[in-house]
Amino acid sequence: MKRDKIPSVSATVDPEFLDNFHLLLTDQTGNNTLKFYCPQIDANAFNYDNLILTLSDAAAHYCLSRRTWEEYKNKPMQLSRLVREKFRRLRTNDGELGELMLFSFLEADLNAPKIATKMELKTNPNMYFNGADGVHYIKLPNGNYQLIFGESKVYAVLMDGISAAISSIHKFKTDTIKDDKTGETRGITFERGLISAHIAQETFSDEDKTFIKSLIYPKASSTYYVDTAFAVFVLFDITIPQEKKKLGNAEFRDWLFNTLTTLIKSNIKEIYAKITRKNLDSHSFYFYLVPFEKLDSANTAVLEGVLQ
């Protein structure tokens, strides 16, 4: 049953999504990969115009299951309206942009297709609980697989976002997330069952269903191994002093890139230490970290641009 490609369960975000960012730093330590991206800059300010366009393309694949997408893909007006409606039903959640960007990075950078559409589950009050923000899979070079559960945070302070994400992942893994409605504690066990129950929404053949189920519930008889991994996306705030904006464009980029790289390098050890303190170091972690200036207003403006 070992396979090279699952045609109906493949990544949908164009790798050109990554061209919206400057990759300032990549760190690989043990099982962990950390990538730090800076948005494009125009005249000493972050420029989100192209990001909005590419996120607009990704939004439909993020919030609609493959079967729903297939139903509406040749009806662009209805498709666009359906996407906007789903987002607007959740606009009280300031983290939606972060979850869309988490999805986009996992698909564009890791080529890790989603296997569950969390937006459809969120908008179904009978199906959703506060579990992972995304569920994807990746085939490794050795032929084995990882089932990746993603966590997204939008925080003013980078390390506060990291701490919150790792704490959430720990609760998720240990099945100690409290359900707001029932008071029950749930986590990865419940999530696996939820995903399994909705496989039909993401697949188009019995063969694909069998494959995806083998990732959710691995069997010793399988021809490949499956390990649980986690992805963390943090969108955080940076303040750019007004005097720095008066620098020449090239000088400004040098200053900003050096400042941001120094910030990340000074925190890498502590980021990995947080994983260790939660006894999660046996898992692979994929970190994607992105700064916005004036985070609250930029977050709102970008998401509104995506939904226009």
Language model region names:
Residues 127-131:
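A short, glycine/Asx- and small/polar-enriched loop/turn
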Residues 110-126:
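A short acidic/basic microdomain associated with nuclease active sites
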Residues 81-103, 124:
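A short, highly charged nucleic-acid-interacting micro-segment common to nuclease
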Residues 163-248:
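Acidic, metal/cofactor-coordinating or nucleic-acid-engaging core segments within structured domains
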Residues 106, 134-136, 146-154:
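Conserved catalytic cores of phosphodiester-cleaving nucleases, focusing on short active-site segments
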Residues 244-308:
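Extended, charged low-complexity segments
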Residues 2-78:
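A structured, charge-rich N-terminal accessory region that forms the first stable segment of a protein
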Residues 107-115, 138-145:
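Secondary-structure boundary elements
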